Amino acid sequence: MGTSEEELKHIVIDLGCGPFFLGINDKHFPGFLNKQSNACAIVNTASRETGGVHWIAMGWHPPSNFYLFDPFGFSDKKLLQIYQFEYNALLKRSAITSSPDRCVQLFQNNESVQSPHSAACGLYCCMFLHAFANWPAHPFDNPTMDQLVGVPNNMLEAPRAQSIFKQNQETLYSFLHYNSSFFRRYENKLRKQTDP
């Protein structure tokens, strides 16, 4: 089932991302259009009319750093193959409008932190946005994201990876319990919606 746009918005605000947060978007997200300030968003790989499929998070750190976080760590090619979603167009729009030399530097994770049987992708995106809001120059390498253990994509279904994913999800829930009053209030419901 996963998390709704409204649930994610409440959690992101609790995590202190409000000043940078552009909102929850579907696959038609226009990219980062303001070149002067940090910005971040959660984007679904499908259009809003479908009800959504998979959440990813993005961050912009001037003058030219574009961060993409996918809880599965998929490449653009894999996202296109599985979800019919491409982020190259977002990169191009952001480069043209936001970067002084019309170039952006893409940073993305390439390891999975989420089980393929989990629906917690939106919650993982919230955790990443907390990292971005606090460490915009290095949102993948900081005390927030260092709590999660990455697994190579080709091991996504491997039995030995499942215990790592289970621990990651418990770490995620603990992080959100500690940092989000909304999550604490609706924790049982959110766990039921996202547990594998």
From Swiss-Prot:
Record-annotated site: Cleavage: 51-52
Subcellular location, record wording: Virion; Host nucleus
Reactions performed catalytically: Cleaves proteins of the adenovirus and its host cell at two consensus sites: -Yaa-Xaa-Gly-Gly-|-Xaa- and -Yaa-Xaa-Gly-Xaa-|-Gly- (in which Yaa is Met, Ile or Leu, and Xaa is any amino acid)
One Gene Ontology term, aspect cellular component: virion component
Signal peptide: none
Enzyme class: hydrolase
Activity modulation: Requires DNA and protease cofactor for maximal activation. Inside nascent virions, becomes partially activated by binding to the viral DNA, allowing it to cleave the cofactor that binds to the protease and fully activates it. Actin, like the viral protease cofactor, seems to act as a cofactor in the cleavage of cytokeratin 18 and of actin itself.
EC number: 3.4.22.39
Expression induction: Expressed in the late phase of the viral replicative cycle.
GO MF, any single term: cysteine-type endopeptidase activity
One of the GO BP terms on file: proteolysis
DNA-binding listed as a keyword: yes
Annotated catalytic residues: 54, 70, 121
Keywords: Autocatalytic cleavage, Disulfide bond, DNA-binding, Host nucleus, Hydrolase, Late protein, Protease, Thiol protease, Virion
Family note: Belongs to the peptidase C5 family.
Subunit structure: Interacts with protease cofactor pVI-C; this interaction is necessary for protease activation.
Role noted for this protein: Cleaves viral precursor proteins (pTP, pIIIa, pVI, pVII, pVIII, and pX) inside newly assembled particles giving rise to mature virions. Protease complexed to its cofactor slides along the viral DNA to specifically locate and cleave the viral precursors. Mature virions have a weakened organization compared to the unmature virions, thereby facilitating subsequent uncoating. Without maturation, the particle lacks infectivity and is unable to uncoat. Late in adenovirus infection, in the cytoplasm, may participate in the cytoskeleton destruction. Cleaves host cell cytoskeletal keratins K7 and K18.
Additional facts recorded: All late proteins expressed from the major late promoter are produced by alternative splicing and alternative polyadenylation of the same gene giving rise to non-overlapping ORFs. A leader sequence is present in the N-terminus of all these mRNAs and is recognized by the viral shutoff protein to provide expression although conventional translation via ribosome scanning from the cap has been shut off in the host cell.
Protein name per Swiss-Prot or TrEMBL: Protease
Biological source species: Bovine adenovirus C serotype 10
Gene designation: L3
